[in-house]
Swiss-Prot record:
Gene this chain is encoded by: hemL
Pathway: Porphyrin-containing compound metabolism; protoporphyrin-IX biosynthesis; 5-aminolevulinate from L-glutamyl-tRNA(Glu): step 2/2
Name the UniProt record assigns to this protein: Glutamate-1-semialdehyde 2,1-aminomutase
Subcellular location: Cytoplasm
Record InterPro entries: 4pyrrol_synth_GluAld_NH2Trfase, Aminotrans_3, Aminotrans_3_PPA_site, PyrdxlP-dep_Trfase, PyrdxlP-dep_Trfase_major, PyrdxlP-dep_Trfase_small
Gene Ontology BP annotations: protoporphyrinogen IX biosynthetic process
GO cellular component, one term: cytoplasm
Enzyme nomenclature, EC number: 5.4.3.8
Keyword Disulfide bond: no
Length: 438
């Protein structure tokens, strides 16, 4: 199937993209934005409000990317805008402690079951890198287990793909990642507890932590199989391994306390990002006091940052988290209702067109996989027809709906998506699917 670029007037975006490639590698500051997976010209955005984006050519789109996850209440939420304006007038950074850091930390500790203490950083990547270092420092061990298809940022020991055999060491997935880093990273199959058990047994007393996306979001939205997270918890307890949940994507999205609240499995450490910053650059890692007290200056594990706990970002995060804390029952009931209606409507559209594709929805995130396989891990996700998805992406874009420009990224929505958006989405989706398969 040949994928044609969207028939949308993107002259200004195209001009910006060509200009950007002279000074920015690939013309973008994060690879997924380049539209390499779907083809065509990436959108250059001018403004956004609620569930809608406007690009540099004044085209408007209903947004299902949500800045890749942070916009649980939509773009330019008045509480966030006011908080950021007020703080900017007092200064954008001090390089010293502020009361707002304490208030945000208290909210995180109150909302997230595993978090007794929390350290603020500037990104999800910083959070996962710091958590892995902390787990190593706490246990005195070197190796970590991660899962194929789980993304934990661009830290060297996370950019590892599978080796040649089920129990081999990992190998670098990017130039610049050394074999020395790779040798301490073990790869397991997501949703395959027996594989994890074999890795632990083959590396007795050497594994510092198991890090997992409790709901995978970077190979499409893939929930954990029943018993998988519980099994990881039991395995870590039995072998004195630190269990780390990467909830950068799922934190505050699938429940007020994230996936750990939704599934009732409590990790030792949790990594957070996206929603916690209200759209500004914030990450965090937290967990048991006993482990967190190993972080400097209390303990020997070093981690620091000039802009960590930045007051501008903390004000934005506080606006979001305080709203979640005050209105969580209403908020998550609304999100669940939208998720259920969207999935049912999508399945109705698929049935009406005789298409046997797989849909996943968990809280305020989901995926439509262009495959009839039961998608439970990276291998089954990769059976999806990426050319068909690319054609679908452009068909939706032409009618004003912006989806992730990759089959293997989750869609996100928030409280800004209501009945009108649902109706528009499903009607447009029906036409787009029919067009792709005509």
């Amino acid at each position: 199937m040949e994928v044609a670029p969207s028939d949308v007037d993107l002259r200004t975006s195209r001009r910006f993209y060509e200009r950007a490639q002279h000074s920015i590698p690939g013309g973008v500051n994060s690879p997924a934005r380049a539209f390499d997976s779907v083809g065509g010209t990436p959108l250059f955005i001018e403004r956004a409000e609620g569930a809608y984006l406007e690009d540099a050519d004044a085209n408007e789109y209903l947004d299902y990317v949500g800045s890749w996850g942070p916009m649980i209440f939509g773009h330019a939420h008045p509480d966030v805008v006011e908080a950021v304006k007020d703080q900017a007038e007092a200064s954008t950074s001090f390089g010293a402690p502020t009361e707002i850091e304490i208030e945000v930390a208290d909210l995180v500790c109150d909302l997230v079951p595993s978090v007794e203490k929390v350290r603020m950083v500037n990104s999800g990547t910083e959070a996962t890198m710091s958590a892995a270092r902390l787990a190593r420092g706490y246990t005195g061990r070197d190796k970590i287990i991660k899962f194929e298809g789980n993304y934990h940022g661009h830290g060297d020991f996370f950019l590892i793909s599978a080796g040649s055999g089920a129990m081999t060491l990992g190998k670098p997935d990017s130039p610049g990642v050394t074999d020395g880093n790779a040798k301490d990273t073990l790869l397991a199959q997501y949703n395959d507890l027996s594989h994890v058990q074999r890795l632990v047994e083959a590396n007795q007393g050497e594994v510092a932590c198991i890090i997992v996306e409790p709901i995978a979001g970077n190979m499409g939205c893939i929930p954990p199989e029943p018993g998988f997270l519980e099994g990881l918890r039991e395995l870590c307890d039995a072998h004195d391994i630190v269990l780390v949940f990467d909830e950068v994507m799922t934190g505050f999205r699938v429940a007020p306390g994230g996936a750990q609240e939704r599934y009732g499995v409590i990790p030792d450490l949790t990594c957070l990002g996206k929603i916690i910053g209200g759209g500004l650059p914030v990450g965090a890692y937290g967990g048991k006091q006993e482990i967190m007290d190993y972080v400097a200056p209390t303990g020997p594990v070093y981690q620091a940052g000039t802009l960590s706990g930045n007051p501008l970002a903390m004000r934005a995060g506080h606006a979001i988290l305080s709203k979640i804390a005050e209105e969580k029952d209403r908020i998550y009931d609304q999100l669940e209702d939208y998720a259920e209606a969207l999935q049912k409507g999508t399945e109705h559209n698929l049935d009406a067109l005789g298409l046997d594709y797989t849909t996943h929805q968990v809280g305020a995130m989901g995926s439509l996989f262009f495959t009839d396989a039961e998608v439970v891990d990276q291998d089954t996700a990769q059976t999806a027809d990426t050319e068909a998805y690319a054609a679908y992406f452009h068909a939706m874009l032409e009618e004003g709906i912006y989806l992730p420009p990759s089959q293997f990224e989750a869609v996100f929505y928030g409280t800004c998506h209501g009945e009108d958006e649902l109706e528009t989405t499903l009607e447009t989706q029906r036409r787009a699917l029919k067009r792709v398969h005509s």
